[in-house]
């Protein structure tokens, strides 16, 4: 029985993995609730997922290093994301007042394209921030690289896109699932989704960072 629960057993590792994602998820949700610290929450989520995949474990010291080196850049990106989403929402409200079906279709297509591009950039910039220091002078370069990586590895990118779209779509189609889905995301689902995104992107990001270092 002692071997069954030993630190090197599969059961212990699985329970440790679940507990880590649970704690990280709760910490991130608290950060998102404060709004201004949302960028740090994303760093915590992506940093923890990266450590789990590369090292098999997450220590507070390692996670703190990941957060400390990029917290300011992450905060700026987060606030820019919020402003961008507010702009898209405002444009969507105006779109409802447009009478011409052609203009409405064209405008709606541009809004959807803008949202998709922003989402693709975010899906790759946060893993980059979690893995290395990004100076202010290189931020725009990293954003362009994130966009290029998202297009270059489109099938992997759409894993994150699917996870992002699936949750609101599920709630829209099944109103009775709202509280269950909300509880899942608040307790575990957010960290689990980030883990899947980081896992899908690990190989191309490893190759990209190795090519930069050489």
Language-model features: where?
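Helix-coil boundary and N-terminal low-complexity module in membrane systems
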Residues: 1-111, 118-214
